[in-house]
């Protein structure tokens, strides 16, 4: 399961969706990144580097840890 987050430089982390399968998470991330005019990435066990506005897909368990 995956969560889709929006990381905003000014406001921090906002959960856009949670508990999605891979394909649904990708669809939500694609749609939200286009709507917000920001990039998107899939975080697979690493930390977010440079702090910028981005839509992020993370494993649900990784976020809870």
Predicted regions, residues:
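A short beta-strand micro-motif
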Residues: 2-8
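Acidic surface patches and DE-rich sequence motifs
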Residues: 8-9, 49
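A short, charged, amphipathic alpha-helix used as a generic interaction element across diverse proteins
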Residues: 10-11, 19-45
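Tryptophan-centered short beta-strand motifs
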Residues: 13-14, 51
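Short, mixed-charge low-complexity intrinsically disordered segments
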Residues: 33-65
